[in-house]
């Protein structure tokens, strides 16, 4: 069993919507509801902890009334950074050995990816899902190409990311003591010298970040319904 942690206190400035992007609609249903539905079907998911902006609590609670989720959902105070929100959420876990940390704006994660991440976390203590980078990657400095990066070993990392509670807590405490801000939770685990297992993600598992992503998400949902 695991607890799902969703850091949901971000402002989503790149979306330019003037509100939390998780409230935006895909096929007339909020993004966050699509995401929660992906996990409520998973028997291994014990409960869900969402780290939110307290000012948005009424909106989240209203969503839960309108779109009930078949898992216990707890709202806690988010932090200034995503990393702070996850750390706060870890403090509220109980009676589980593992947590999965997932972006609320990734509504198309499959049960297979979820299970693969959990299995790898049980094996290694920490795990991520990722897909091969398809585009050519270049290092650029001051508007000029410095080098073309060999992409054969490069992966685009997604969520969920899975961890044993004790390991993730250790990694976050170490980062906090050193004022280190990572780009994801796995980077904190890497920083303390621990292994992170990697499983195959999905190109459908997009993060809805920009207006263009919303259009793509609508198309994905249309394909799924077919």
Swiss-Prot record:
Function: Catalyzes the formation of 4-diphosphocytidyl-2-C-methyl-D-erythritol from CTP and 2-C-methyl-D-erythritol 4-phosphate (MEP).
Similarity annotation: Belongs to the IspD/TarI cytidylyltransferase family. IspD subfamily.
Signal peptide: none
Pathway stated in the Swiss-Prot or TrEMBL entry: Isoprenoid biosynthesis; isopentenyl diphosphate biosynthesis via DXP pathway; isopentenyl diphosphate from 1-deoxy-D-xylulose 5-phosphate: step 2/6
Keywords: Isoprene biosynthesis, Nucleotidyltransferase, Transferase
EC numbers: 2.7.7.60
Organism field: Bacillus cereus (strain ATCC 10987 / NRS 248)
GO BP: isopentenyl diphosphate biosynthetic process, methylerythritol 4-phosphate pathway
Name by which UniProt lists this protein: 2-C-methyl-D-erythritol 4-phosphate cytidylyltransferase
GO MF entries: 2-C-methyl-D-erythritol 4-phosphate cytidylyltransferase activity
């Amino acid at each position: 069993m695991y607890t799902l942690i969703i850091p949901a206190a971000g402002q989503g400035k790149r979306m330019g919507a003037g509100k939390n992007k998780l409230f935006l609609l895909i096929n007339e249903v909020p993004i966050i509801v699509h995401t929660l539905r992906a996990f409520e079907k998973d028997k291994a998911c014990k409960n869900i902890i969402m780290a939110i902006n307290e000012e948005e609590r009424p909106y989240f609670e209203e969503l839960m009334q309108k779109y009930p989720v078949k898992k216990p959902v707890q709202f806690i105070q988010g932090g200034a950074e995503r990393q702070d929100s996850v750390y706060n959420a870890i403090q509220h876990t109980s009676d589980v050995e593992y947590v999965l940390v997932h972006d609320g704006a990734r509504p198309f994660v499959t049960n297979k990816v979820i299970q693969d991440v959990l299995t790898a976390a049980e094996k290694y203590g920490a795990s991520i899902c990722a897909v091969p980078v398809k585009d050519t990657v270049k290092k650029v400095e001051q508007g000029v190409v410095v080098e073309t990066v060999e992409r054969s070993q490069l992966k685009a990392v997604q969520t969920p990311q899975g961890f044993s509670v004790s390991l993730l807590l250790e990694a976050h405490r170490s980062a906090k003591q050193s004022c280190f801000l990572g780009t994801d939770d796995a980077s904190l685990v890497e920083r303390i010298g621990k292994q992170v297992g990697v499983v195959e993600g999905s190109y459908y598992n997009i993060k809805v970040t920009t207006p263009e992503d919303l259009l793509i998400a609508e198309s994905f949902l249309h394909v799924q319904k077919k």
